[in-house]
Amino acid sequence: MQLTIPQKLIDLAHAAPFPLYLVGGAVRDALAGLTCSQDWDICAPCDAERFSKLAADNGFTVNGTYKNTGTVNLSDGKHKFEFTSFRTDVYRRGEHAPEKIVFTDDIETDARRRDFKCNAVYYDLRSEKIEDPLGGVSDIENRCISTTRAADEVFSEDGLRLMRLARLSAQLGFTPDLECIFGAKFNAALIAKISAERIFAELQLILHADEKYGRKYAHYEGLKLLEGTDILNYILPELAVGKGMPQRKDFHDHDVLEHSFRACKYSDSRIRLTALLHDTGKPAVYAETGKYHGHDVAGEKIVRQILERLKAPKKTIDTAARLTLLHMYDLDGKARESKIRTFIVKNYDVYPLLLLLKQADYSGCKDDLNVCPGILKWDRIFAQMQQENVPFTLRQLAVRGNSLNFVPANQRAQILKSLLLFCACDGSRNRTDTLLREAARLSEEHQSGGKA
């Protein structure tokens, strides 16, 4: 077992008059031969105030002591640690925070309050021995996940454990046992008791599960487990309803839900969330028209509703909704070059992300990892625009707002945007004299009742 422990923590363990243990991710990862987690969780049969004083006396910075939960946050200047007293927790059904905490000196009692056996293996920092009260080492060796008690009991206590199961399984490549699966499925509705912010944070971790230990497509495995345990029905019902909805066989090998999963599977990490949600408009428009046409427009609104419900950051919401609206443009490859040039300039700020989404969408149709043909066309046009020095932003225009003193102040912003589009099809137009003439024409047209 390769476990590199900060020396100050080892020194603290030798100074303590009680055994001090490392527990959780760091021990699990070391035993599994994975890159050691930097989550330094420590515990002992000792109350928080006593431990806090001991840590401070041994050169640690104590950032918070919470005697009601038996928790101490501390740092050695390089690493952060969280200490928790041995305890057992009593929950109100499904809620993340325990309703009652009872402290104990028994390591097995402490182990049984935890979620999974693989997270309930202790490393004695003084004796350098493993303490395994529940058989977690065997689970780690066999790369499986089982609960510390009856699965129904563990999941009924804390609804967030439902998503944590999917995340850990995906990140680690560990397989949940059947009791675990059935226990999660039976309690899936309890995810509704967890705050939207926590659900979104856990979803993001699942969508980036491949980044934790470098397991390719780990995020896809996590999503499939959310589906298999019915949790998807509660956190993303607009997505889950796509299960079983067929699509044209000449374009798709998968139903709407599986296509969304596969688009996410093959997507760049920057657009995972959008790739997952980009077709959520399909079930809605199909229910109204029996067709999928217009699902991009409906999807923009639905994606916005989903992410607002999950209290995602505003920028995340706006970007995902906008990319969803744009993802069908020129799908058939028939758009004229002039139209594509204008489209690129209008959407230049999200253009790289849109190409990533288009590629993910293409790959998710028939698991084809070749470059999407439409992207080859767009790349050629974009490269030509760059060669022509087409301006893509207002800062790249040869004129500024203060150059348009002959234009009413309330028109200048719109005129500048129109000038940008004016240059889209011909970069040579980006000259001061040419743009000033065009600005004068647009202003006159606007004042005479036309639109710039």
Regions found by a protein language model. Name each.
Residues 1-452:
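Catalytic cores of the polymerase beta-like nucleotidyltransferase superfamily
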